Amino acid sequence: MSEGKKPGSGRKSSGRGQRDLRVRVKSAKGRKLSSTLWLERQLNDPYVARAKREGYRGRAAYKILELDDKYRFLVPGARVVDLGCAPGGWCQVAVARVNALGDKSGKKVGRVLGVDLQEVDPIPGAEIHQLDFLSEGADEQVKAWLGGRADVVMSDMAAASSGHKGTDHLRIVALVEAAAQLAFDVLEPGGTFVAKVLAGGAENEMQAMLKRNFRKVANVKPPASRSDSSEKFVVAQGFRGRGDAEDVENGEDDGA
C-alpha cells in the first residue's frame, strides 16, 4: 500500500512522497500514541497481510510454521496439545501438518487438542476445550481428551503485559515452567515441547530444567518474530520420560 500521490502522476516530484511506501496512521483524538504505533505496525507488517490472504487467524502462525520447517516435530500422525491456543493460528498449522483432517492420502492421521481460558471459535480438524491448564487434574483431563499421551506440547502464551520489561520477563518464564511441568506429565518419551519466552536473564533455571528432561534444547528466534521483540522460542526435543530425567544432570544444547 502507498500513500499520497502515486509515482508517474505527470508532475515531477521531489521524491519526499516516494521515500517510504509504508502506511502512515494519523493520530486520532483520544487514541494513545502506543495504540497508533501498534496500528501502523500492523498495517505495514507483511506477515499480517499474508495471514489474511492465507486464512490464518494471526501472524503468529508463521512462527510455528518456521519452527517446524527447521525442527520437523509436526509430522503426520502426531498428537499435539496447544496450550493457550487462542486465537487459533498455531492449531490451524498443526491440523494441516499432522494431517488431522485425514486429507493427505497414505499419511497417518494426527490429533490436535487446543485449550484456553477463553472460548475459541471452532477450528476444523482441532478439538478445542476451555480449560485452565494450571488447575488441579488438568494433565489427566488432557490425556483423557487425547485418549493417551501427546507427541507435542506447544505454547505461544504470554502473561498480560505490566508495562515493566523485568516483570513481564519473570511472568512469562514462570508460565513456561508451568507449561513444561504439564508437558512432563502428558508427553510420550521422545516428545517435543515448544514455548515462547522473553529474553531477560532469568530463564537459566528453566533452561536447565529442560535440559535435564530433553535430549536436545534449542533457543530460536524465527524470521516471523519481530526484530524489535525480545521474544524467542525454546524447542526441546527427545523427552526422556519422568524416570530417566531424574538421573540426568545436563542435556545437549543446540544454540542460544
Swiss-Prot record:
Catalyzed reaction equations: uridine(2552) in 23S rRNA + S-adenosyl-L-methionine = 2'-O-methyluridine(2552) in 23S rRNA + S-adenosyl-L-homocysteine + H(+)
Compositionally skewed regions (Acidic residues) per UniProt: 246-256
Keywords of this entry: Cytoplasm, Methyltransferase, rRNA processing, S-adenosyl-L-methionine, Transferase
Region described as Disordered: 1-20, 219-256
Signal sequence interval, chain numbering: none
Compartments where found: Cytoplasm
GO cellular component, one term: cytoplasm
Pfam families: FtsJ
Active site per the UniProt annotation: K196
Primary location recorded for the protein, binned into one broad class: cytoplasm
Listed GO MF terms: rRNA (uridine-2'-O-)-methyltransferase activity
EC identifiers of the protein: 2.1.1.166
InterPro entries: RNA_methyltr_RlmE (IPR050082), RNA_MeTrfase_FtsJ_dom (IPR002877), rRNA-MeTfrase_E (IPR015507), SAM-dependent_MTases_sf (IPR029063)
Chain sites annotated for binding S-adenosyl-L-methionine: G88, W90, D116, D132, D156
Role according to the record: Specifically methylates the uridine in position 2552 of 23S rRNA at the 2'-O position of the ribose in the fully assembled 50S ribosomal subunit.
Family membership: Belongs to the class I-like SAM-binding methyltransferase superfamily. RNA methyltransferase RlmE family.
HAMAP family to which the protein is assigned, alphabetical: RNA_methyltr_E
Protein's name in the database: Ribosomal RNA large subunit methyltransferase E
Organism of origin: Paracoccus denitrificans (strain Pd 1222)
